[in-house]
Amino acid sequence: MALMRIRSFVLILPCLALLVLCAGAPPALGDTDLETPQQLFQDLFAAVQDAQIFSDGKSFVDAVPNSAPNLILQEFRAQRPESKEALAQFVAAHFTMPSSAYAAPSPPQQVPLLEHIDRLWDELTRRTPTAPTYSSLLPLPQAYVVPGGRFREIYYWDSYFTMLGLGDAGRSDLIDGMVSDFAYFIDTFAHVPNGARTYYLSRSQPPFFFAMVGLLSPQDPAAAYARFLPELRREHAFWMEGEKDIRAGHAHRRVVALADGSILNRYWDDSDAPRDESYREDTLLARSSGRPPQQLYRDIRAAAESGWDFGSRWFADGHSRATLETTSIVPVDLNSLVYGMELAIRDGCERNGDAACADEFKRHAMQRRAAINRYLWDASGTYFDYRWTQRQRVPRVSAATVYPLFVRLASSRQAHAVAATVRARLLAPGGVVTTPTATGEQWDAPNGWAPVQWITVAGLGNYGESALAQTIACRWLSNVEAVYQRTGKLVEKYDVMDLGKKGGGGEYPAQDGFGWTNGVTRRLLKLYPDPARCARELSALPRS
């Protein structure tokens, strides 16, 4: 019966219709209901992934078993299919394969880009108050927008950028529902998982929940923060778990105590096993890396929590995935977002008349700001990540340097210095490049991503760098339009060095859809509606 409780929201939907979240406790969850496909299917799982029955390992972990996992496993062990063909037949007989989140292209000559984006919202919307029995999918009470392609479930940080466009499209219903879904996750699991799958529960993603909540009441965000204060505080507790007992120079889960006792955060994952969705890639890398496998798996998973999986930011040698050191890094973006979360909690506490809480979180935020300035700010005009295990900054420029501007942490002097760094090191013909380093990884050159563009444009705008912000926006819009004119699609990532091309690299082919690209592009089309200006930006660029 526990399985039925986790898989259905039928009983709680009436109260969700009246309130954003039910006042009572969420449905009871049994531990066995939350086992991942790797845990459920054991040697069958390893055999399927190692044999590469599917070109994308995520296909198998998203498949729905046709009967109880223990019975399927027993039958597998009895039959022991030895050939790849026999194993594929066994899988086909015992599992129902998932479909992709298809986003139909439009003929660009007939459908303008903005109209195409608005057509896609319904195509990418899912409602899963129940999930198939034994599925890895986590059901959610409200409708939500998925990114698209292989990403057929809701994702944490993607959703903030998707919501930007939903708001401009008049889809406040979806924003309200998605915020409620994330609040439900926090109330149920004490954090927002990477995505709505059992195999994502051991990690989160960049904590944008406070920013999503702010979208509910743009003119008075404190009112929304007050409404969701329990969830904001619970998520903060998740990221800060262990801070009170940690000694200087040590780390525990997501908190790091630096040499002077300052507390900052890192990315982490509670599992040190290969990822379910990328099992084969992880085990092959471990075999060739010469590193203890569990240590490498933890750093792989922590990079997945960062959302930047993968890129040179996390590589000890700057170019090889085998040298991943994510858990040794105190990142600029994460600590900026936790600072923003702390200010949001302060504002919510003030609105609720809780002065002690407001003072506490103001103090947390000010201490974090001081530590960021002490450890991450560099006189060259850049915020760098910090390698806490060696007490040194990592002197590599990345678009993460703009996050302190996004949450208004930087001073005016720092912000204008960062703007100069963006102009000199990151500005490209098609927008902002993620890093200037070309490694073949998807979070490096020549790729640009929608979230990077928005964080940069919004951050620069916070400090009066409007001309540079508009240049970036126009270049991004021109690039998105060029790909749309050629393909009729919006995609996950773009080549910002060579206009009109999709981005490449990574563990899987470029995906269409695409939630956060749609959201950011639609918001930028509203903020910068002058096509003539963007045309001038494009015409001034050198042709390859």
Model-derived segments and their meaning:
Residues 327-352, 446-454, 459-463, 467:
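Long, repeat-rich segments with strong aromatic
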Residues 12-23:
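Bacterial N-terminal signal peptides
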Residues 216-227, 345-360, 463:
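Inter-helical turn/loop segments and adjacent helix faces that build the functional surface
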Residues 186-228, 511:
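Aromatic/His-enriched, Gly/Pro-containing loop or helix-boundary segments
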Residues 21-31:
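Bacterial Sec-dependent signal peptides at the C-terminal "C-region" and cleavage site
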Residues 155-185, 400-411, 453-466:
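Alpha-helical support elements that line or immediately flank enzyme active sites
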Residues 40, 47-153, 177-192, 196, ...:
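Extended glycan-interaction surfaces of carbohydrate-active proteins
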